[in-house]
Regions:
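Residues that form generic nucleotide/phosphate-binding pockets
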Residues: 91, 131, 162, 166
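A structural signal for the main folded, soluble domain(s) of proteins
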Residues: 4-12, 24-29, 60, 65, ...
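M16/MPP (pitrilysin/insulinase) zinc-metallopeptidase core fold and M16-derived inactive scaffolds
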Residues: 45-124
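M16/insulysin-pitrilysin zinc metalloprotease superfamily fold
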Residues: 78, 113-151
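N- or domain-start disorder-to-order transition segments that initiate the globular core
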Residues: 2-48
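Secretory-pathway/luminal and periplasmic proteins that interact with or process carbohydrate-rich
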Residues: 81, 98-102, 134-139, 165
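Hydrophobic, small-residue-rich alpha-helical packing segments that form membrane-like cores
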Residues: 145-166
């Protein structure tokens, strides 16, 4: 079946396509794009107590500097509206979420959100998006999360330690 396009509009989002999955024809996926920001959203609705979101941003670089992985970690340390470490984890606990997580691939970084029920999901999503799109990038965050030399004069930092384990 060819995707249908009816250009329904909700707020600043316009539906671009609506198509059933070939391997699950009862599951229809919709593609929406914000006319304000260009943000693209893929949406599938089905009966399930868990809600999932994958906030995926392009992060391809052509060096092995580790900048996307570093940024992935720094995002969780705060945002412009919520400039405190741990805000997302506190919200996740109250939303019956499975915590916060992310991964970095060759060309993108994906931030995940899974909650039980829509109430917590709808409370968490704007805060999570603020962290992803407007992170506080501080020297202190870099020293704590990425790289520093500890009191024993050893290389340390969460990102540094992760990369040493590979």
């Amino acid at each position: 079946m060819a995707p249908s396009v009816d250009s329904e509009v909700i707020g600043s989002f316009r539906r671009l396509a609506r198509e059933p999955l070939p391997y699950a024809p009862d599951l229809v996926v919709e593609k929406w794009r914000s006319t304000a920001s260009g943000l693209t959203v893929l949406w599938a609705q089905f009966d399930n107590p868990l809600l999932n979101a994958y906030i995926t941003v392009a992060s391809e670089i052509f060096t092995d500097s580790g900048v996307p992985h570093t940024l992935e970690h720094l995002v969780f340390l705060g945002s412009q509206q919520y400039p405190y470490k741990g805000v997302l984890d506190s919200l996740a606990n109250r939303a019956f979420a499975q915590g916060t997580n992310a991964w970095t691939a060759n060309d993108h970084t994906a931030y995940t959100l899974t909650t039980a029920g829509s109430d917590g999901f709808l409370r968490m999503l704007p805060v999570y998006c603020d962290h992803v799109f407007f992170p506080t990038l501080t020297d202190a965050g870099f020293v704590t999360e990425v790289y520093h030399i500890n009191g024993k004069l050893e290389d340390a930092g969460v990102v540094y330690s992760e990369m040493q384990g590979r």
